[in-house]
Amino acid sequence: MRIVIFILGILLTSCFAGNEIESGSSKIKISMLVDGVLDDKSFNSSANRALLRLEEDFPENIEKVFSSAASGVYSSYVSDLDNLKMNGSDLIWLVGYMLTDASLSVSLENPKISYGIIDPVYSDDVQIPKNLIGVVFRIEQGAFLAGYIAAKKSVSGKIGFIGGVKGDIVDAFRYGYEAGAKYADKGIEIVSEYSNSFSDVNIGRAIANKMYAKGIDIIHFAAGLAGIGVIEAAKELGDGYYVIGADQDQSHLAPRNFITSVIKNVGDALYLVTSEYLKNNNTWEGGKIIQMGLRDGVVGLSNANKFEYIKVIERKIVNEEIIVPYNHEGYEIFIKQILKL
């Protein structure tokens, strides 16, 4: 369940003006730990590019940047974060919801280090430390647009969704997508499965081939490297088999098969928050979550201009005329109350 959220515009005017963490120092070291692999052609790649861009744009502020990757267990995350601390890091970014628990423990243990985390999943009763800022995305809003397009474009009337490991973030993709599809066409058939992996390309390909064999002609995925297998399956099958990507524009991997990608501009968000920190004498007031969505320009679709008809739907979401569900409970309410199904 989501905790109380602070809107981006309000936060950026206040969160850097309070308690100082190592304020006024000269050049600093910024580090990042991602869950999985750095070059995942998606989520982590976007964050890593942002870190390198910060180093280029703020040479007078940044001494050095570090990037590291880990996967699997809590102890591994904490060990890697400790290594980044020992490297002299002043600001450490954690990328991926699997690092949620680690973000709390390391920030509490190291109050003089500033921490940021992308896509944390905290329970309602968690008190976020003052040196920790979380960034979450209303990714269900972008997925809703993708589902709407998929339902309109499908020839067979059957579309699919493949998620990685089931959890709040992946479910937001799924239920936003399903809600958008049903909003466009109440009769659309939707099949959703989970690969239980963010790294197994072969399982992604196998699930996609099974779906395509059953007449599904469009698959949206949010599965990390397993999603590469979905792309490969569509590419091998050729025309008439389509995919919708996740996190960043992946259309170059299969131009003839891509409809669009649900964009989560992880890099832009990381860059924005970090640049504000640098511009404000390295002052970092945490204890808050920043929520970003369509309104902030960090969630949306690649090649959005290709789908002019979707702009009406986008405006309704931004104006809260459509409240997009991000979990199963919200989806059931959406279906019953909004669509009367």
From Swiss-Prot:
Provide the membrane topology annotation: Lipid-anchor
Name the source's superkingdom.
Bacteria
Cellular component annotations (GO), alphabetically ordered: plasma membrane
Write out the annotated subcellular location. Answer: Cell inner membrane
Instruction: Tell me yes or no: is Transmembrane among this UniProt entry's keywords.
Output: no
> Where does the record locate the signal sequence feature?
1-14
Q: Which InterPro entries match?
A: BMP_lipoprotein, Peripla_BP_I, PnrA-like
What do we know about how this protein assembles, alone or with others?
Monomer.
**Name this protein carries in UniProt:** Basic membrane protein B
Report the gene name. Answer: bmpB
